[in-house]
Curated annotation (Swiss-Prot):
GO biological process assignments: amino acid biosynthetic process; aromatic amino acid family biosynthetic process; chorismate biosynthetic process
Name of encoding gene: aroB
Recorded metabolic or biological pathway in which this protein acts: Metabolic intermediate biosynthesis; chorismate biosynthesis; chorismate from D-erythrose 4-phosphate and phosphoenolpyruvate: step 2/7
Cellular compartments annotated: Cytoplasm
Protein role: Catalyzes the conversion of 3-deoxy-D-arabino-heptulosonate 7-phosphate (DAHP) to dehydroquinate (DHQ).
Originating species: Zymomonas mobilis subsp. mobilis (strain ATCC 31821 / ZM4 / CP4)
Residue sites binding Zn(2+) per the record: 192, 256, 274
This protein's name: 3-dehydroquinate synthase
Note describing how the cofactor binds: Binds 1 divalent metal cation per subunit. Can use either Co(2+) or Zn(2+).
Length: 379
């Protein structure tokens, strides 16, 4: 996974006394030791990753440490969404305790969103808070889950229902890590990139329409631009509403209320990746907005067309979901955004004009989810 080292772009996350920065650049893995050492008081590194990343990327990562004379310890977990569980959380905490982890050691989450969420939550609760570093290796993690401090595991009732806000001390993003990703994982990550255009940036969505296919196919310039743009967009929102108090950060949940219900129906498994669920969920959010005479027919047609062109699901059928509207709404009842018995939804008045609606009728949602538009993307 070697490459020439490119110019490093730094994006600050301004959160007062727990602010941090994100470094983005091709070839940064080659400089990992020198970049990370300032964040570790006693120069002890513990890398936590999954079986897939361990096979493809861990050897080179460890090599850079060994060549610098720095010891690095590794913990390898199973790959897949099922790893975000009580069982694996307890097992990871036990392993870290047995290895004598200290609060100021560098616990490194090297992997995709699953590893980042699990390791971040373990760091949040272990010894009442250990520092950790995010090194995301999937496109989804690089543009979304590694930024903002949300950490969590899943449970039987739903996705990410058990967790904490716990910010990393640093995030290192090397786009070259994406070279070993399967095409489906890249498409899933792209599902989160599109979201930023749909929320409040119609020009960026237009850019996605023009460059999305090239990004997925491996165009380095497009990837670097999309990663930086997405991170800057999220950084502004997180700095303004870190813990979803004012409601602004809730905008980042576009597609997620529908999407999490789809993931629940497919058992939080690799049958439907998170980014795929968000893509389908975004189409559903705009579809419902169209039904409510908020968004135009042209907008929903553009979204469905682009999702299909980039290999992402734009309907329940394409996502492999057969549950009825009522069954999907039942999954939504455990949503974290539930407030006073009502579930807010991210809807839109057009591309780039998303808003939070706290007065949505769930019976109307259920009926919409049984419609041809939701089922087949037919409009």
């Amino acid at each position: 996974m070697s490459s020439e080292v490119s110019k490093t772009v730094t994006v600050p996350i301004d959160l007062g006394n727990h602010s941090y920065k994100i470094d983005i650049g091709a070839g940064l893995y080659q400089q990992a030791v020198s970049i990370l050492t300032p964040y570790v008081r006693n120069r002890r590194f513990i890398v936590i990753t999954d079986e897939n990343v361990a096979r493809c990327q861990l050897p080179e990562f460890e090599k850079s440490f060994h060549e610098a004379g720095v010891t690095v310890d590794s913990i390898i977990l199973p790959a897949g969404e099922a790893t975000k569980s009580w069982h694996h959380l307890a097992e990871l905490c036990d392993q870290l305790i047995r290895r004598g982890v200290e609060r100021r050691d560098a616990i490194i989450a090297l992997g995709g969103g699953v590893i980042g969420d699990l390791v971040g939550f373990a760091a949040a609760i272990l010894k009442r808070g250990c520092q950790f570093i995010q090194i995301p290796t999937s496109l989804l993690a690089q543009v979304d889950s590694s930024v903002g401090g949300k950490t969590a595991i899943n449970c039987e009732a739903g996705k990410n229902l058990i967790g904490a806000f716990h910010q990393p001390v640093f995030v290192l993003i090397d786009p070259d890590a994406l070279q070993t990703l399967p095409a489906r994982q890249l498409r899933a990550g792209y599902g989160e990139i599109i979201k930023y255009g749909l929320i409040d940036d119609p020009d960026f969505f237009a850019w996605c329409e023009e460059h999305g296919a090239a990004l997925i196919e491996g165009d380095k310039a497009s990837r670097l631009y999309a990663i930086e743009h997405s991170i800057r967009a999220k950084a502004l929102i997180v700095a303004d509403d870190e813990k979803e108090i004012s409601g602004k950060r809730a905008l980042l949940n576009l597609g997620h209320t529908f999407g999490h219900a789809l993931e629940a129906d497919t058992g939080f498994s690799d049958k439907l990746f998170h980014g795929e669920a968000v893509a389908a969920g975004s189409a559903l959010a705009f579809g419902f907005s169209y039904v409510k005479n908020l968004a135009s027919k042209e907008d929903i047609q553009r979204i469905i067309k682009h999702l299909r062109e980039t290999g992402l699901p734009a309907s329940l059928e394409e996502a492999g979901v057969k549950a009825s509207g009522k069954e999907l709404v039942a999954h939504m009842m455990h949503d974290k955004k539930m407030e006073a018995g009502r579930l807010p939804f991210l809807l839109a008045r057009g591309i780039g004009k998303s808003f939070l609606d706290k007065e949505v009728n769930l019976e109307e949602i259920a009926a919409f989810l049984d419609s041809p538009l939701a089922r087949k993307g037919t409009i």
